[in-house]
Amino acid sequence: MPPEATDEALDSLGQAGVVGVRFQMVPNSGNIMAWDDMSPIAQRIAPLGWNINLQLDGRTLADYEALIARQPCRVVIDHVGKFLEPVTPLDPAFAALRRLLDTGNVWVKLSAMYETSRTGAPEYRDVGLLAETLVR
């Protein structure tokens, strides 16, 4: 969604079943949104009940923690934080994810562990440990 999308365009998207805007922030995966666009877009979609779906390298969460936390709409972070190099539950970036979840306005998908796991199936012990920590 371009930041300059009209209200009519948003209404049309909502009528078609759209309920959120995806921010794809993983390097070399398109980066079709800019971090500076997050707040203006969030202000526009919050009254519609939409959410931001955020895909980023979780190792950068601490850099964007304040920005993410202040959004007026729900923010859903993909894939157990999508730490492109798996981290431990003691990592500062994982601590940032946990603080964001504590706000009550940020959610995380416990999905697609295969995308970042280095230990692999069937247990995905590295990324699985993060998911286990989050559900405790």
Regions from the PLM with identified roles:
Residues M1-E8:
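A metal-dependent hydrolase metal-coordination microenvironment
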Residues M1, M25, D78-K82:
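A generic structural motif
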Residues V19, A34-R136:
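Catalytic pocket-lining loop regions of alpha/beta-barrel enzymes
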Residues E8-L10, P89:
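Short aromatic-enriched loop/helix-cap "lid" or pocket-rim segments at secondary-structure transitions
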